[in-house]
């Protein structure tokens, strides 16, 4: 069973949720055997079967080495990060992480300003403070402040819907 958060000794505290799940408790329901794994670890294991035309290159040549590492990144209620790597014998290993908790590192003056704005609200600004559902709202509000405009949007889904309906709107820009 794949769940959001780090698995420790067969137990997991779900990320962004008060729930705790354990293999032992699930086995009392008659589920045997039970193995809990991180949701992005599961996605890393599945990455090699994703059709090539469904993948996006984030740098380097479009046709990379088929034996190279595969990064899996994805926003949701948080920002998931994992990788599928191969050892020197060619054996695959899925490497889950809590990479969404890494600090946001601005790359230009606008991102510097976004960080400055978010630091007024948060002691520490991680990647998932920007890239996930709730993070989308943080980013939208920061960009509105930078642009000197008001935003009355309180729902990340509304930002997405507005951007899809009008790519030239502040939500889509």
Write out the residue ranges for each language-model feature:
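Residues on a specific face of well-ordered alpha-helices
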Residues: 24, 28, 42, 79, ...
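Short acidic/glycine-rich loops and adjacent helix/strand connectors
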Residues: 24-33, 97, 118-120, 138, ...
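Conserved active-site and cofactor/substrate-binding residues in soluble primary-metabolism enzymes
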Residues: 21, 109, 113, 131-134, ...
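A mobile "lid/hinge" subdomain adjacent to the ATP/sugar-phosphate binding pocket shared
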Residues: 121-173
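Glycine-rich phosphate-binding loop of actin/hexokinase-like ATP-binding domains
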Residues: 59-128
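ATP-dependent carbohydrate kinase catalytic cores
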Residues: 35-64, 154-173
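Short, acidic Gly/Pro/Ser/Thr-rich loop/turn segments
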Residues: 6-8, 78-82, 138
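Short beta-strand-loop/turn "lid" adjacent to the catalytic site in phosphate-handling enzymes
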Residues: 1-37, 41-54, 72
């Amino acid at each position: 069973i794949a769940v959001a958060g780090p698995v420790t000794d067969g137990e997991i505290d779900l990320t962004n949720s008060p729930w705790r799940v354990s293999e032992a408790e699930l086995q009392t329901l008659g589920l045997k055997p039970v193995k809990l794994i991180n949701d992005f670890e599961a996605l890393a294991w599945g990455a090699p079967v994703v059709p090539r035309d469904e993948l996006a290159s984030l740098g380097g040549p479009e046709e990379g080495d088929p034996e190279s590492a595969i990064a899996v990144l994805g926003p949701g209620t948080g920002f998931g990060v994992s990788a599928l790597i191969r050892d020197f014998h060619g054996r695959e290993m899925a490497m889950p992480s809590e990479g969404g908790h890494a600090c946001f590192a601005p790359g230009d003056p606008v991102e510097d300003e976004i960080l400055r704005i978010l630091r007024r609200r948060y002691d520490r600004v991680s990647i998932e403070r920007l890239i996930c559902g709730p993070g989308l709202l943080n980013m939208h509000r920061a960009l509105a402040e930078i642009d000197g405009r008001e935003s009355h949007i309180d729902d990340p889904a509304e930002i997405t819907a507005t951007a899809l309906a009008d790519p030239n709107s502040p939500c889509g820009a």
